[in-house]
Amino acid sequence: MNVKKPVILAILDGWGIEEAGVGNAVANADQKFVKEMMGMYPWVKAHASGEWVGLPEGQMGNSEVGHIHLGAGRINMESLAKLNHEVKVDGFLTNEVLVDTFKYVKEHNSALHLMGLFSDGGVHSHMNHMISMYKAAVKFGLTNIKFDLITDGRDTAPKVAEQYINQLLQVIKDNNNIGEIASISGRYFAMDRDKRFERSAAAYITMTERKVDQPKFTDPIEYVKAAYENGLDDEMIVPAYNASVVDSELKANDAMIFTNFRPDRAIQMASIMTNNNYPAWNDEAFKDVEFIGDKIRFVSTMKYADSVTSQFIAYPPTPLTNTLGEYISSLGLKQLRIAETEKIAHVTFFFDGGNDYFKNGLAKPEEISLPHASIDLISSPKVATYDLKPEMSAVEITDKLLEEVKKDEFDLIVLNFANCDMVGHTGNNDATVKGVKVLDEQLKRIHDEFVLKHNGVMVITADHGNAEIMIDETGGPNKKHTTSLVPIIVTDKTIELSDFDPAIAKVAPTILDIMGLEIPKEMTQPSMIIKK
């Protein structure tokens, strides 16, 4: 089968649209080529947040949800919305895996540990879910409950953990003082996803051991305040255990529930907790560290990865079918996914709705087994934070992409540029401006080769906003995602795009339309191309 035109879907992760002004790194980057394209090609401003991507109304978009909807061609009720519903109906008290876990703790006279990102960011988790699980455990009759809190500062304002922890302490007080905060760790450590095992080790050891030389506290609020005084945001709070809590560490016969619902930043820690064959256990950072996974019951809220060897998943997956990638493969067409390390799972696992991974039992979410599909993985730079290298690996991605384009082998190429999101999350406005400028240059390189020389079409869009709002309402740095609209640019002067309810869930059907292919019935969103 031949396509009418090959397509590159270029996902500018975190590139939103807002009025120009101080703190708008996208507008202030003097993106000459993007402006040129917007004057030359059809484009629309599209929704990438809230109900348009299966989230609660007003909830900012995120990379996982954005990539799912870019590939799905339909609006899918996301994990946040599902778990919010469970909170409303007391569903945690009827969930078989959770109830069995409560029974396990009772039978073993042990402790229930609740670990997770404790904030209202709603990207990887929501504090209300952990609180609701806690209340369910209390109703069940558990009295030994410990919280292993991961502080955010990235999908929230930089310094709000004190506020959230105070709310939790009040909840504990309202429930007869059942429960204690056992440990606190910034997400930089506990939610690393780039195999920086020394970060994971700091959080793991804090939760599983009580060594004299480890950071510790006796008052969680004072510990967070001290971190602020030392110039640390919530994200960077050094892992520490509560020395005033007897047996604060995870012990044999305890149960742990990881309350994060988004997989990518949960996989590494959950794998370390459950799988002694995971590569971290061969790393120097884990030398002489005890593996606890064979002595506890570990529960993940959602399916994270096969490397997480615990069999207990509270809410097993229901994969999407006939996503763009799966459908393209079923037609015998060739496709390529390309991204740097930080985002490879987004152009594979998330873009495919988890379908290829869950169906075919891949070892890693970032792998792909779809017929006629290939991956080019470019390493992310090894820096502490990406404002130190705002160009990230965008140039290397483009170099590799242009090599592939010149082969004329692929009908569809899906690529991710991470700069606006990953540099934007540092809160460094100047660095983010530099990152955006680099992307403008790379888009021109791709356009001039693929569109002008190979008669291809680029569909340029984003999964959510971020870099367009770098300063928050207080005048401080904004590190979190936004509810801004995002662009959808199609480099084909022969078409016209409808601006009726534009949303990123319409990207997949639009791509199929450009390629001259039938849109499968599972894609309930229409193409944006106006039929003449």
UniProtKB/Swiss-Prot annotation:
The protein's enzyme class: isomerase
Active site residues according to the UniProt entry: 63
The protein's required cofactors: Mn(2+)
Record-listed Mn(2+) 1 binding positions: 421, 425, 481
Keywords attached to this entry: Glycolysis, Isomerase, Manganese, Metal-binding
Binding site for substrate: 124, 154-155, 187, 193, 262-265, 343
Record's keyword annotation contains Manganese: yes
SUPFAM superfamilies associated with the record: 2,3-Bisphosphoglycerate-independent phosphoglycerate mutase, substrate-binding domain, Alkaline phosphatase-like
Domain of life according to the entry: Bacteria
GO MF term set: manganese ion binding; phosphoglycerate mutase activity
A Gene Ontology biological process term: glycolytic process
Residue numbers binding Mn(2+) 2: 13, 63, 463-464
Cofactor note: Binds 2 manganese ions per subunit.
Enzymatic reactions: (2R)-2-phosphoglycerate = (2R)-3-phosphoglycerate
E.C. no: 5.4.2.12
NCBIfam families membership: pgm_bpd_ind (TIGR01307)
Assembly and interaction partners: Monomer.
Assigned protein family: Belongs to the BPG-independent phosphoglycerate mutase family.
Described purpose of this protein according to its UniProt entry: Catalyzes the interconversion of 2-phosphoglycerate and 3-phosphoglycerate.
Protein name, per record: 2,3-bisphosphoglycerate-independent phosphoglycerate mutase
Organism from which the protein derives: Mesoplasma florum (strain ATCC 33453 / NBRC 100688 / NCTC 11704 / L1)
